[in-house]
Amino acid sequence: MVFKMSEMDIIKETYEKIKNMEIRGAGRIGRAAAKALKEYALKISHLNEEEFKNKMREAGNILISARPTAVSLPNVVKYVLKGLNEENPKERVIERADEFINSSLKAIENIGKFGANRIKDGDTILTHCNSEAAISVIKTAYDEGKDIKVFCTETRPRNQGYLTAKTLYDYGIDVTLIVDSAVRYFIKEIDIVVVGADAITANGCLVNKIGTSQIALIANESRVPFLTAAETYKFHPKTIVGELIEIEERSPEEVAVFEDKYKGIKIRNPAFDVTPAKYIDAIITEVGLIPPQGAWYIIEKYFGWLEK
């Protein structure tokens, strides 16, 4: 993607960081997009209203294209840019960006409180990847004085689980890091699974880091509760009318780089998979716990502002 305007630098920088996973996690991605739109709006506020709107929409489309699976991106961009249709659009876009950032941080806090209610003293928790929301649940349970242990999967190929393990260890929590393929071996030691979410569909399916669906299947087989922590802006409104979520496939070089002799070996690297609703015990949102079958209600209630 080619960027020509110096004023577009903040959009370019944010796009590249999201695309290259320097900024990772749906919540962080959403806040980064809102912040970039705010800064860009301030830079181009000297333009007339029509030019301002066109430039903001262009910037929004660029950001959305960075990660096709992360529904937080289009939802956040649409939320912020809805200000273009209101009185004083320049001011409203900036205000709506701030509103989203503040509400997103508050959502993480509330998810922690609701989710911690499902964690019992003495529980061993399994988590996957590097989710702010899931980490908030675990930290809150620990802050409540519960004696807990956490197993983190390494989360190949980018090893985001290392980040989670370090974060929880620094917080004082007992942490064990395991390879992704060892989940079934250790499931007998696990009391509850808590993961994050990149998207929730209208029928309650979970789109999350590759490997999540296998963990859910193993947990279901072993009768271990499987919960996903998801802010309401991660619910995908267009799935209610049958739109499918595109699963991003990333560079094969993230997995392995072979010498020339083996260049013919194909490598597939999907970043996400889909966990069916039947394997999910509850979705932890900032408004409370809901069954996966209630996802359509969240979309209907909280996405009235998402217009085509």
UniProtKB/Swiss-Prot annotation:
Matching InterPro entries: IF-2B-related, IF_2B-like_C, Initiation_fac_2B_a/b/d, M1Pi_N, NagB/RpiA_transferase-like, R15Pi
Gene3D superfamilies: translation initiation factor eif-2b, domain 1 (1.20.120.420), Translation initiation factor eif-2b, domain 2 (3.40.50.10470)
Reactions it catalyzes: alpha-D-ribose 1,5-bisphosphate = D-ribulose 1,5-bisphosphate
Active site residues per record: 129, 198
A Pfam entry, by short name: IF-2B
GO molecular function: ribose 1,5-bisphosphate isomerase activity; S-methyl-5-thioribose-1-phosphate isomerase activity
Binding-site positions, substrate: 24-27, 67, 208-209, 234
Entry EC number(s): 5.3.1.29
GO BP annotation list: L-methionine salvage from methylthioadenosine; pentose catabolic process
Keywords assigned: Carbohydrate metabolism, Isomerase
Anything else known: Reaction proceeds via a cis-phosphoenolate intermediate.
Function recorded in the entry: Catalyzes the isomerization of ribose 1,5-bisphosphate (R15P) to ribulose 1,5-bisphosphate (RuBP), the CO(2) acceptor and substrate for RubisCO. Functions in an archaeal AMP degradation pathway, together with AMP phosphorylase and RubisCO.
Record-stated family: Belongs to the eIF-2B alpha/beta/delta subunits family. R15P isomerase subfamily.
Protein's UniProt name: Ribose 1,5-bisphosphate isomerase
Organism: Methanocaldococcus jannaschii (strain ATCC 43067 / DSM 2661 / JAL-1 / JCM 10045 / NBRC 100440)
